[in-house]
Every structure is written in structure tokens, then in C-alpha cells.
Amino acid sequence: MSLHDADIREPLFEFLEEKYGKVRIIEEKQMGRSRADVVMVLPEAVAGIEIKSDADSYVRLGRQVKDYDRYFDYNWLVVGSTHAMSSREHVPEWWGIISAEQIDPEKPVLDFYTIREAKRNPGADVKKKLKFLWREELSHIQKLNGMYRYSSKSKDFVIRKMAETVPEEILHRQISEELFERDYNLYS
């Protein structure tokens, strides 16, 4: 049976929670000119996950890789079994690769295999990652770090000041904390 994106998502989320413990999953997040299929928030990092099911092609992947590499600390390509052998050719060596396979066609159970572990992305830009945060979340990080609020300045100005002032390792942790605590009900 050929796997589609919808067949992979929920079992993938369970696999990631088993593998990493505390995670927050955000689906379909715009970043640059691409949309991340899945954003996985970890305690000190944010990972981007691109799903290429058996029904997908690699046509847009080149552009997607460039966008993912600007925003995320780690990146994963999750592929259906038809792409498992060729997947390495399409992403940089720091990208992790996970294969999703349906062992028994009679059962909707998937097995996931790590083909390659993700390594820290050398091109990630903390300023790009800060753009994922809402203005209130940025204000909270400013407060935590004793920064002036700059309430009349643009979001880009505030992000630039934060990146200049707060050590990156602290920002990585604080960005994750804000995303873990985000309450989507406040704006629904």
C-alpha cells in the first residue's frame, strides 16, 4: 500500500513523543517561501520536519531545504518507503532521515526507522526563529532578560535587539519555553 501524508502524520507524532519525550507539535507553519509540514518544539531547540509520502515527489524540496535551514536548529526528512533509498541525495548531511513503512497491509500500523540522525544545522539563524514568536512572547523574553521593552518599535527591531543582547543558548531555551506555553485559545 502506498502511504500518503495523512497516513504518516499521527503515527509520526507518537513516534517523536516516544523518541524525545517532551515535545510540542505545530503543524503547517509558514517559514520564508515554504511551509513546514511539522515544527517540533524541544526543550532547547526547534526542529523542522518535511514529510515526503510515497505519493510525493522531490520537485520543491530544494527550495524547502533552503527555507528550513534558515529557521530550524535541526531538520528531518520523513519519507515513505519508496523514497527511503534515494532520500540521502536530496538533503544535506546534517538533515536526519526517517522512513515510514507499513509492514502489514491489513493493519494501519506504521513502523519508523531512523536512516540518519539529525545534526545541529550550521545555517540556523536565531533571528528567524524569533519570528515564530508573537509580540507578547517576545515581550516576555525581554522582561526575563531585563531588556527595555521597545513597545513602539517594529517586531524586526525588537528581534534584532534581542539577538544582539541575549546569548544565543539562552534564547534557544527561552524560545522553546514560549512555544511550549503558547495558548492558541487566546486568539481563536
PLM feature segments, named:
Residues 31-46, 88-105:
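Conserved N-terminal glycine/acidic-rich loop preference
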Residues 1-2, 148:
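General N-terminal leader/first-domain-start detector
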Residues 96-188:
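Non-catalytic C-terminal interaction segments of nucleic acid-processing enzymes
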Residues 56-99:
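Catalytic cores of nucleic-acid endonucleases
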Residues 33, 55-56:
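Short acidic loop-to-helix transition motifs that present clustered carboxylates
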Residues 45-54:
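Active-site ExK catalytic segment of metal-dependent nucleases
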Residues 3-43, 161:
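Active-site metal-binding core of divalent-cation-utilizing nuclease and nuclease-like domains
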